[in-house]
């Protein structure tokens, strides 16, 4: 497969960072859901996509990585859902062509920042096509693997796998809170490296559980805007009683997420949006059909 950027204003550069948070112990919220050890400090892998005026050609970014991540995805699905998909089904994804480059010259100006925080057993690479497109419009885009919650994270010391669903979490709110600290740790790391970006202008994209973590981050830090893709807000509501918006927030609901929870007796995400989101002047809602 080949992912091309449409209507790009800039070429896109790529780099990965290994973030070690020496003053933060491994949270229970993550080690109870994975093969992380309790006696360790927090480590994160972070992808950064940045705009450049250099020319690029499509490259097979993941071709030579040690782990076949397509196979890892299939193993996770088989383990989680009790199915028997052939492990080679997605192996071709390692050969994907992406319209990005490495070691590109940066723009003279410092670009605004967009942070991507994934959902439960998600991955920093799952929205790569969207993130590259955003970077091509002049943004520095930072995608975080929330180690232990992510489907897999290939740390230098070994691969960490998510092994637990929401039922295995002692408190889902704590997962979201610790994810919001991951975001802060990542931004602090990049700022301390004097990374070439405008960290006074930060927006966030949060998918599902990442929507909760992004909202919590913005409650404590200045955010330009908040983009919520099928946000998982019920655990937040159960913890704090209301969802108080503090910045421009765009709620994007897919058809399967919206319709799939309309008829259940428990509180659902659509009801949270309709009845418990406060400061609605900050909110815009979007509904996507044919999303599945």
Residue ranges of predicted features:
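Alpha/beta-hydrolase active-site loop
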Residues: 148, 154-196
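Alpha/beta-hydrolase fold nucleophile elbow
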Residues: 195-208
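Active-site machinery of serine-nucleophile hydrolases
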Residues: 49-53, 57-88, 125-165
């Amino acid at each position: 497969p080949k992912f091309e950027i449409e209507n790009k204003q800039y070429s896109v550069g790529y780099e990965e960072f290994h973030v070690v948070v020496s003053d933060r112990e491994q949270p229970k919220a993550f080690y109870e859901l994975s093969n992380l050890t309790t006696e360790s400090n927090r480590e994160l892998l972070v992808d950064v996509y940045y705009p450049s005026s250099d020319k690029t050609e499509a490259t097979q970014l993941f071709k030579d990585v040690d782990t076949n991540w397509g196979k890892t995805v299939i193993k996770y699905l088989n383990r989680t859902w009790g199915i028997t998909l052939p492990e080679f089904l997605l192996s071709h994804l390692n050969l994907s062509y992406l319209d990005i480059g490495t070691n590109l010259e940066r723009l003279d100006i410092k670009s605004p920042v967009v942070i991507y925080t994934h959902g439960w057993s998600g991955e920093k690479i799952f929205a790569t096509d969207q993130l590259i497109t955003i970077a091509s419009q002049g943004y520095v885009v930072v995608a975080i693997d929330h180690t232990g919650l992510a489907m897999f994270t290939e740390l230098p010391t070994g691969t960490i796998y998510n092994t637990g669903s929401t039922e295995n979490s002692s408190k889902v709110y704590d997962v979201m809170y610790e994810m919001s600290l991951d975001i802060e740790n990542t931004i602090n790391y990049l700022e301390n490296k004097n990374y070439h970006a405008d960290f006074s202008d930060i927006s966030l994209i949060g998918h599902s559980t990442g929507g909760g973590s992004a909202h919590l981050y913005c409650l404590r830090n200045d955010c330009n805007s908040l983009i919520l893709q099928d946000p998982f807000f019920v655990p937040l509501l159960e913890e704090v009683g209301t969802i108080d918006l503090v910045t421009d927030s765009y709620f994007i609901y897919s058809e399967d997420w919206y319709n799939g929870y309309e008829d259940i007796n428990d509180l659902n995400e659509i009801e949270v949006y309709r009845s418990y989101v406060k400061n609605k002047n900050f909110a815009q809602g979007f509904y996507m059909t044919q999303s599945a």
